Amino acid sequence: VMQWLMFQMGGVGPMQGQANVFHRYAPEKIPYAIDRYQKECTRLYEVLNNRLADNEYLAGDYSIADMATWPWISGHKWSGLSIECLPHLTRWFEQIAKRKAVIIGKDIPDEMEAGTGKSKVDVIRDFVI
């Protein structure tokens, strides 16, 4: 469990975060940065896909490693990426998305943009840039 949690903390989270920022939020599009972080995310997705070929979850049973990794993978489209060609990662992603706690956790009210006159994307952009 710790190995896969550290994989998320040291790889998936930081790289996915950078891919999201440069692809979606940065005021200036920097092709080198977008390409670099998208390629690294793709590599990390492939590692996860290979692991999930023989395991239902990252560490065998559902664990904090899955809980910490899933939200980052859920942002793949925000980074201009797809997981469709990775069948094991896609299966894992969809399986976790159906969990009751995930469904409840994703039900975020629109209070984030209340009173700002800005969209959620603009509020997030102001926060991350």
Task: Label every PLM stretch briefly.
Residues 13-18, 107, 117-118:
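Short aromatic-enriched loop/helix-cap "lid" or pocket-rim segments at secondary-structure transitions
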Residues 109-129:
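Acidic/histidine-enriched, glycine/proline-rich intrinsically disordered or flexible terminal extensions
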Residues 5, 106-109:
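A general structural motif at alpha-helix termini
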Residues 4-100:
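GST-like fold's C-terminal all-alpha helical module
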